[in-house]
Amino acid sequence: MGRKLLGLLMLAVLLAGCAGVPSSSAPQAIGTVERPAPSNLPKPTPGMDPDVLLREFLKATADPANRHLAARQFLTQSASNAWDDAGSALLIDHVVFVETRAAERVSATMRADILGSLSDMGVFETAEGVLPDPGPIELVKTSGGWRIDRLPNGVFLDWQQFQATYKRNTLYFADPTGKTVVPDPRYVAVPDHDQLATELVSKLIAGPRPEMAHTVRNLLAPPLRLRGPVTRADGGKSGIGRGYGGARIDLEKLSTTDPHSRQLVAAQIIWTLARADIRGPYVINADGAPLDDRFRDGWTTSDVAATDPGVADGAGAGLHALVNGSLVSLDGQHTVVVPGAFGRMGDQTGAALSRNGRQVASVVTLHRGAPDMAASLWIGDLGAEAVQSADGHSLSRPTWSLDDVVWVVVDGNNVLRAIQEPASGQPARLPVDSVAVATRFPGPITDLQLSRDSTRAAMVIGGQVILASVEQTQAGQYALTYPRRLGFGLGNSVVSLSWRTGDDIVVTRTDSSHPVSYVNLDGVNSDAPPHGVQMPVTTVVANPSTAYVAGPQGVLQYSPSADGQQGWSEVPGLTVPGAAPVLPG
């Protein structure tokens, strides 16, 4: 990353309170692959006014190919030689140039709003704030018209052109348990669809973003490499992943020999390509032989369905709810109190089913809101008895990890994991290191929910959505690392949150105009329709198809994929004031 731009980015982060952008240990220009420039990029013309030329230059920086060759056409040779375009870029909008003009030379300063950043790996993160003065930009008149003769190091991307040039794709890496794959969204500028598969597999081999380096496994890590570009399954170079053409991936230097690891190699490749609309069959070879002889003619997504990142946890368990402080299930349009401890206990204020839907973790709160308020965490099989596993003045709504361990926040600041000791069967409370979160975002954690793959934790702190990585240390302990804020547009209005997918979070808010919103891993937020929602809304739970929220009239549901559904509808049987929805997670 250029020193000037790094300094500007750090200053902007301090001013705006936005999250820093991770940079790789060996920065490189964004997208150094040599390929044709997109046809919609501007070029300098002899009659172009200096102000127009500067704006067109910012648009041209959206193409990273060949070390920003498209943008370098706007520079004099000396400026091009001096310009350091390595590292991350700032995405800017509402640009104003303040110019001082002479006959043969123009000096300009740039003012703009910062909307985000794009790392050298293609990681985009939203931000907010005003661009600190990057330094003067100077233009000179040449025989071919005005050209930029001096400019700050680093890359400034025009927001509109960025949206037109880059496309969001998702890489997938294996979770530590090998049960599923974890999303790592990237933005790539590849105008030729036939080059996209090669670009994505190359990025897989290069590895995950820095904040994921200790939370996922990359079965495609070096020395493994591509033997050549990805082709059609029959070796053709056009129509890759289109129709029935499929894709052929030839790898070499694969050290993995056990079948499960090879299955994960395939899963990483297949889900990455399939989610980019590069269709199979996927012929995957390693060192001149099929990755797995069973699939020498090609893999499909069905062959790696066990790791499907889009599968809903415990789908067969169905929707449950807390009604009058007890756990109920739905039988058609009627509720049934569940047997066992969770149906008998009253005063339950937050609950979650385990990922497989067979266990329950629930918080019982006595004297809620009073000085002597007391909360306790209970864990047990659904329909059976429960064991008290933690207590405190207050406890957050529990959340389950992929390995069936319950996480909860005690008294707003102490994150712990509640487990059963293997030898004694007794409950044990293991602290989670959350110093990085508390240092950067001080204040009580009012909600904490683990992602389906359990490599990320989303939290509500001071009405803001804070995302952190879940790292397991060499000693076997856990820590929340790389905390950053998501959804600047949500302000401080967030009440509760839930993971809809591994990349998308649903939140309830105190904003009556937008009571329910979504925010993704990039930090981009959008709003669900407000129709049918009464304020206030509190608990939210979600799966890939449906979001459920607790409101004054009971539990409401919304399915974005449902044809013609423009608002929220009541859940039959749960139109009870104070009812709170419960799902696996």
Swiss-Prot record:
UniProt keyword terms in alphabetical order: Cell membrane, Lipoprotein, Membrane, Palmitate, Signal
GO CC annotation terms, alphabetical: plasma membrane
Membrane topology: Lipid-anchor
Keyword match DNA repair: no
Lipidation (S-diacylglycerol cysteine): 18
InterPro entries, per database record: GerMN (IPR019606), Lipoprotein_LpqB (IPR023959), Lipoprotein_LpqB_C (IPR018910)
Keyword Signal: yes
Pfam family, one: Gmad1
Signal peptide: 1-17
Region: Disordered, residue numbers: 24-48, 560-585
Domain of life: Bacteria
Annotated lipid attachment (N-palmitoyl cysteine): 18
SMART domains listed in its UniProt record: Germane (SM00909)
Subcellular locations according to the entry: Cell membrane
Record-stated family: Belongs to the LpqB lipoprotein family.
Protein name stated in the entry: Lipoprotein LpqB
Taxon lineage: Bacteria, Bacillati, Actinomycetota, Actinomycetes, Mycobacteriales
